[in-house]
C-alpha cells in the first residue's frame, strides 16, 4: 500500500495511518471501530474527488487495483459469449468520480487503454457467478445490500437494467461516503440507512463479506426484519472474528428463513482460501 497517493493524516507515519495499519494486522473485532474513526477523519480532511485512492479505502479494501484471475475470466467470457456483453462492458467503466484519469491509469484500471476498473469487474463477477443477469435483475423492484463498500454495486445493477429502489445498510461513516458518490452519479432511488428496522423485505438481498462479519445479535435482528426476502446472494469466509460461519449459516440462518422450501446453492471460491475457505451462498424460490 505504500504507493497509495493519499494517506490518512498525510503520510504513512501519521498516527491515523498507523492506527489503521495496526488494526489490520490484529484482524480482531476492533478492526471496524478503528476504521470508522479513520474513515470519518478522512471524509473531513481528504479530497472527496479522489476518495478511491485514500489509503483507508484501500485498507478495507473497498477498492482493488488487482483482482483474482477467475473474476477477470468470468467478465471476459460474459462480454464475448453472452447476449448482454455490451451492457456488462458499459457497467464496469470507471465513471471518473472519486478519482482522476491519472488515478485510474496508475491504480484502478484492469486493462491498458480501457476504463474498466478492477473493483467494478469484481462486483460484476459476483453477479455473473451467481446467475444474476440483466434479465433477472430487471424484473426486481426492491434490492437490499448489506455493506456496499463505496457503493459500486448499485450503480452496476442500475446499469444492468434494474429500475427499482435499492436500499443499503451500512455504517454511518461509510454511508456518508456512499451518499456523496451516489449523488454525484445522479442516483435518486438509492436509500442509505444505518438501522435494520428501516429495511424492507426485498426481492434480493446482497451481502458480500458483510452479513457474515456482523455480530450474531445484529444478524438476528436483520433476519427478523427481512428474513422473508425472496432471494439472497451471500459471500462469506468460514471463520471470521471467532465465529464459524458455516455452522451459523447451516444450523441457524437457513432454518430461520425457512430455506427448506427454497433452492439453496453453495458455490466454492477456491482462489480465496483464507479464513477457512470462502463460498457464495445463493437462495432462490
Which residues are covered by each model-predicted region?
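N-terminal accessory regions of S-adenosyl-L-methionine
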Residues: 1-118
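Conserved class I S-adenosyl-L-methionine
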Residues: 139-149
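Conserved SAM-binding loop of SAM-dependent methyltransferases across substrates and taxa
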Residues: 150-162
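Conserved S-adenosyl-L-methionine
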Residues: 159-166, 230
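S-adenosyl-L-methionine
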Residues: 180-199
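A short SAM/SAH-binding and catalytic strip from SAM-dependent methyltransferases
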Residues: 205-217
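A short, conserved alpha-helix within the catalytic core of class I
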Residues: 214-226
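Conserved beta-strand signature within the Rossmann-like core of class I S-adenosyl-L-methionine
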Residues: 229-242
Amino acid at each position: 500500500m505504500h504507493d497509495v497517493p493519499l494517506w490518512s493524516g498525510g503520510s504513512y507515519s501519521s498516527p491515523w495511518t498507523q492506527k489503521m495499519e495496526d488494526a489490520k494486522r490484529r484482524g480482531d473485532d476492533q478492526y471496524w471501530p478503528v476504521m470508522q474513526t479513520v474513515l470519518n477523519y478522512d471524509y473531513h480532511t481528504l479530497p472527496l474527488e479522489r476518495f478511491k485512492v485514500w489509503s483507508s479505502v484501500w485498507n478495507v479494501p473497498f477498492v482493488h487495483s488487482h483482482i483474482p484471475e477467475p473474476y477477470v475470466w468470468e467478465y471476459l467470457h460474459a462480454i464475448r459469449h453472452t447476449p448482454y456483453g455490451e451492457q456488462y462492458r458499459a457497467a464496469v467503466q470507471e465513471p471518473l468520480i472519486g478519482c482522476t484519469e491519472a488515478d485510474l491509469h496508475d491504480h484502478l484500471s484492469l486493462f491498458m487503454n480501457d476504463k474498466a476498473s478492477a473493483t467494478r469487474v469484481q462486483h460484476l463477477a459476483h453477479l455473473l457467478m451467481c446467475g444474476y443477469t440483466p434479465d433477472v435483475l430487471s424484473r426486481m423492484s426492491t434490492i437490499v445490500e448489506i455493506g456496499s463498500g463505496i457503493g459500486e454495486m448499485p450503480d452496476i445493477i442500475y446499469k444492468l437494467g434494474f429500475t427499482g429502489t435499492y436500499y443499503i445498510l451500512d455504517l454511518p461513516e461509510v454511508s456518508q461516503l456512499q451518499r456523496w458518490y451516489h449523488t454525484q452519479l445522479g442516483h435518486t432511488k438509492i436509500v442509505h440507512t444505518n438501522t435494520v428496522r428501516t429495511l424492507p423485505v426485498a426481492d434480493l438481498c446482497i451481502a458480500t463479506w458483510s452479513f457474515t462479519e456482523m455480530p450474531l445479535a445484529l444478524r438476528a435482528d436483520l433476519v427478523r426484519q427481512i428474513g422473508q426476502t425472496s432471494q439472497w446472494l451471500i459471500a462469506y469466509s468460514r471463520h471470521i472474528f471467532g465465529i464459524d460461519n458455516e455452522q451459523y449459516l447451516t444450523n441457524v440462518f437457513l432454518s430461520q428463513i425457512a430455506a427448506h422450501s427454497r433452492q439453496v446453492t453453495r458455490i466454492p471460491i477456491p482462489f480465496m482460501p483464507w479464513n477457512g475457505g470462502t463460498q457464495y451462498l445463493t437462495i432462490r424460490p
